[in-house]
Every structure is written in structure tokens, then in C-alpha cells.
């Protein structure tokens, strides 16, 4: 039975925007967060203000390792899931997926601000102050791993285990093509409109038939906005300064084509 959830603590009680040790800093913050089922896990947040990127990593209750990399310089967001395989059903030890989408302004705090975050009480279990709506994304385009560095240099490292399973959306591809990206790195995947017999994997009974797979993940806690406080000097002039962060939680569901249901055994009717 799930116990009562603790109210979110104000960010100002535990996070401080400390000065950076140098002009470009790498920093890591580890926070304890509560998963939807009530379990507590540790989430790692890393920021590199030099390359202008951040990375968040946490383990789901089912053992899957979820990583979100935000590349501010290229306006690219990379989700990676390392999913434990079902060995008794012929799967490998783990399965890797990468979902690449456009990073919009103000989705998450800048890397420079993330690198400054410090925690006053590391044992406290964090809970997001704001729950942002579930985003359901149709990942209808495959990304060529060998050419993906043009999109973001982080794809080479983050998606190394998912070379044949990197997905994005056609609407994001249009945005990147307008920025001058090479279109040869993208391949449009089959859809139900192209193949009338193409089913959702959870409805497909043949493990060797192609289908549309769904995978859901949630970033349970991340700094989504900066908070500003006001101060007044001796002359009475009011000025604003950064004094903390607001935390958010957001869930995602990705739909994408797989050549056989064997690659999507978690998506079954229960």
C-alpha cells in the first residue's frame, strides 16, 4: 500500500546557487527521489557549462536505467533507456533505446546554473514541486548512428549501445533540416498508414511480426526554472538575483516501429 507523500520542500531551503570554481565547470549533484510506487532511488545530475550540456540519470523500479542529456548548444534532447532483457524469452541481457527530440527554451535550467547547485541535506527525499503533463510522442524516423554526431556530439557516447534503435520525430527533423543538417542521417520508418496490418505490439500475438512499440519513462525530479528574489540597496533601488530553483516531474510515452515484437516484450496486455 502506498504511503502518504510528503509535501515538497521549498527549493530555497536546500539548494544554493554557489559560485563556480572556474570559467567552465563540471559538477555533479546526487539527490534522493521518490518513484511513483513509493520506492526511493538516487538521481544523478551532471552539468558541464563548458560544453553547455546537462545529464540526468536514475533507475526505474523495474531496474531500467534512464538517462536524459540536454545539449543546449545544438538544441537537442536525448533520452536513453537501458532495459533489462528477459533471458528466458530469448532476449539479450539488456536492450538499449535512444529517443532524440528538439530541446525547447525554458524546458530546464541552463547548464551554468545547474553546475552551481548545492544541496544542504543530502538525505532528504525530494519531490517535485510541479508535475508537468505527460507527453505522448510518435517517433516515426530512425537516426543513423554513424552520422548522428552532426545532430549532437553526445549521441556517439550516449547512444553507443543503441546504434540500431535511435528514434526521432518527423517534425523535429524538419526543424533540424532548416538549420542545415544533413538529411541522409534520417530514415522515415513504416507507419500504420503505410502498412494496414501493422498493429500495436501489445495487440500482436506473433513475436516475430513487426509492430508499433510503446515505451514510457518519467524524469521524477529536475530543476525546470530559476527562482528570483529581490533586494533593495541603501538608496532604495530594487534589483533581482537568482536565489534557487523550481523542481518539476515529467513523463513521456514514445511510440516507434520495431521489426519484430521480440524487441518490445514489455508492451503487452495485462
Curated annotation (Swiss-Prot):
Is Signal tagged as a keyword? yes
Keywords recorded for this protein, A-Z: Signal
Q: Key word Signal present in the record?
A: yes
InterPro entries in the cross-refs: Oaf, Oaf_C, OAF_N
> What range does the record give for the signal peptide?
1-24
Cystine links in this protein are: none
State the family named in the UniProt similarity comment for this chain: Belongs to the OAF family.
This chain's protein is named Out at first protein homolog
Source organism (scientific name): Gallus gallus
Amino acid at each position: 500500500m502506498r504511503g502518504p507523500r510528503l509535501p515538497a520542500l521549498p527549493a530555497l531551503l536546500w539548494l544554493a546557487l554557489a559560485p563556480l570554481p572556474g570559467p567552465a565547470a563540471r559538477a555533479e549533484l546526487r539527490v534522493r527521489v521518490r518513484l511513483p510506487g513509493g520506492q526511493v532511488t538516487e538521481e544523478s545530475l551532471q552539468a558541464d557549462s563548458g560544453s553547455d550540456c546537462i545529464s540526468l540519470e536514475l533507475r526505474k523500479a523495474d531496474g531500467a536505467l534512464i538517462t536524459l542529456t540536454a545539449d543546449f548548444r545544438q538544441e537537442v534532447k536525448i533520452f536513453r533507456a537501458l532495459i533489462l532483457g528477459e533471458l528466458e524469452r530469448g532476449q539479450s541481457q539488456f536492450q538499449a533505446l535512444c529517443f532524440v527530440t528538439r530541446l525547447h527554451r525554458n524546458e530546464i535550467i541552463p547548464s551554468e546554473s545547474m553546475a552551481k547547485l548545492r544541496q544542504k541535506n543530502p538525505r532528504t527525499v525530494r519531490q517535485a514541486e510541479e508535475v508537468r503533463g505527460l507527453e505522448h510522442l510518435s517517433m516515426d524516423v530512425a537516426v543513423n548512428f554513424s552520422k548522428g554526431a552532426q545532430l549532437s556530439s553526445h549521441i556517439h557516447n550516449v547512444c553507443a549501445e543503441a546504434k540500431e534503435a535511435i528514434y526521432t520525430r518527423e517534425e523535429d527533423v524538419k526543424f533540424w533540416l532548416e538549420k542545415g543538417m544533413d538529411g541522409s542521417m534520417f530514415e522515415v520508418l513504416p507507419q500504420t498508414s503505410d502498412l494496414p496490418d501493422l498493429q500495436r505490439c501489445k495487440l500482436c500475438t506473433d513475436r516475430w511480426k513487426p509492430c508499433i512499440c510503446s515505451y514510457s519513462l518519467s524524469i521524477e525530479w529536475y530543476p525546470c526554472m530559476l527562482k528570483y528574489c529581490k533586494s533593495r540597496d541603501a538608496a532604495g533601488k530594487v534589483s533581482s538575483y537568482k536565489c534557487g530553483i523550481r523542481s518539476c516531474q515529467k513523463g513521456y510515452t514514445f511510440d516507434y516501429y520495431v521489426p519484430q515484437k521480440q524487441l518490445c516484450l514489455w508492451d503487452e496486455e495485462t
